């Protein structure tokens, strides 16, 4: 995993050059937006349990067969596994947002996820739906448009961070499909 700083150093080192120019400007921007980034991660992790349970509930409401005998969320053990997977995905999305880099998400969460779900018979369309619900929730929290819970954020526009987190959820959806 490379955070924004490590990535700049590795790129400059590969060119045998000092850190400067656009790389240095990108780091300045990353630091300037640091409080907004931390607030965005905090909004996700502070609401993680509710986000995951709401996403799984929404997925089940749209596909009640999941909790019928033989469904993938039938029995407490399977439901717990579904909730656990949602928590893991959300945790790695928050890591990626904190680092400003998707490599931790790709390497430690998405690598082999589709194959695992296929082997376990997990319906991918339902999983993708749960991920899309979490994506909408995360964007709402980051842009402070969640109707039930407002967060205090550092001054400034957070739409770029909302777009960034949305792209991480899109990667999860693409990895599962």
From Swiss-Prot:
Identification of the protein by name: B-phycoerythrin beta chain
Q: Which residues bind (2R,3E)-phycoerythrobilin 2?
A: 158
Q: What is the protein's membrane topology class?
A: Peripheral membrane protein
Locate the residues binding phycourobilin. 50, 61
* Chain residues that bind (2R,3E)-phycoerythrobilin 1: 82
Primary gene name:
cpeB
Write out the PTM section of this UniProt entry.
Contains two covalently linked phycoerythrobilin chromophores and one covalently linked phycourobilin chromophore.
Its GO biological process annotations read: photosynthesis
Q: Does the keyword Membrane apply?
A: yes
| GO CC field | chloroplast thylakoid membrane; phycobilisome
């Amino acid at each position: 995993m490379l955070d924004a700083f490590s990535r700049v150093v590795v790129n400059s080192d590969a060119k045998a050059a000092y850190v400067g120019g656009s790389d240095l400007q990108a780091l300045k921007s990353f630091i300037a937006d640091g409080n907004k980034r931390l607030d965005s991660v905090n909004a996700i992790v502070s609401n993680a349990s509710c986000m995951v349970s709401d996403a799984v509930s929404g997925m089940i409401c749209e596909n009640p067969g999941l909790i019928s005998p033989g469904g993938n969320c039938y029995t407490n053990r399977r439901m717990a596994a579904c909730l656990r997977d949602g928590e893991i995905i959300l945790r790695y999305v928050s890591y990626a947002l904190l680092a400003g880099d998707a490599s931790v998400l790709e390497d430690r969460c998405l690598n082999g996820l589709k194959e695992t779900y296929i082997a376990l018979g997990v319906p991918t369309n339902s999983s993708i739906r749960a991920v899309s619900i979490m994506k909408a929730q995360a964007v709402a929290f980051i842009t402070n448009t969640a109707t039930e819970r407002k967060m205090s954020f550092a001054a400034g526009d957070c739409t770029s961070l909302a777009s960034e987190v949305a792209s991480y959820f899109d990667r999860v959806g693409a990895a599962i499909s």
